[in-house]
């Protein structure tokens, strides 16, 4: 039995509309365990809006979840870093020491269903033992498309008149010397594939 401190669901992996609907189904009418912090990052603005429109977002919030921006976040250790020696369940696609932002945290990669059930139980939990079979969640015929916050690039003609304003802390990238055609040096470190 593994007690947990934190659960993070979503980001760019395991954050589709269907994944989020499964999470909302599990959380509906339940509460996140007192000792657990649950953070959910829907995979896109469209997914977030669809969850808001059908009531699933309210189910997540009512259960005690913190809703994060649809962006990189806990996956890269930017926010929601677990406490020192804490146990965090995450639905992300990467895991290595320190990735969460806390070098000595215990990070377990799990499915959205395991994450949601465990957030309620306060410990790593098999959803099949708690819920039995999950219902099928049908993919909507039409997905919401709302790009109202995306600023399209200027045309070639318009771009000549675009002024880019830099603050005093923004500097141009230093330009180095071009690489030589041939480089001969000693290799000091070779790393494996799990970086």
Residues of each region from the PLM?
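Fe-S-dependent hydro-lyases/dehydratases of central metabolism
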Residues: 1-195
């Amino acid at each position: 039995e593994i007690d947990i401190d934190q659960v993070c669901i979503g980001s760019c992996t395991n954050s589709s509309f269907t994944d989020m609907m499964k999470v909302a189904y599990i959380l509906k009418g339940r509460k996140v365990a007192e000792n657990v912090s649950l953070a959910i990052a829907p995979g896109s603005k469209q997914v977030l809006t669809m969850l808001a429109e059908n009531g699933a977002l309210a189910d997540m919030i009512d259960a005690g979840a913190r809703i994060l921006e649809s962006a990189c976040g806990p996956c890269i250790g930017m926010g929601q870093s677990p406490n020192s020696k804490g146990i965090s369940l995450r639905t992300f696609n990467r895991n290595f020491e320190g990735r969460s932002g806390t070098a000595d945290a215990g990070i377990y990669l799990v499915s959205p269903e395991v994450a949601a059930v465990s957030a309620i139980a306060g410990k790593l939990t098999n959803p099949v033992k708690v819920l039995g079979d999950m219902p099928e969640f049908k993919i909507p015929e039409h997905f919401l498309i709302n790009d109202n916050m995306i600023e399209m690039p200027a045309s070639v003609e318009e771009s000549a008149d675009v002024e880019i304003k830099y603050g005093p802390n923004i500097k141009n990238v230093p330009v180095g010397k071009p690489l030589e055609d041939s480089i001969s040096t000693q290799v000091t470190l070779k790393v494996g594939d799990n970086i």
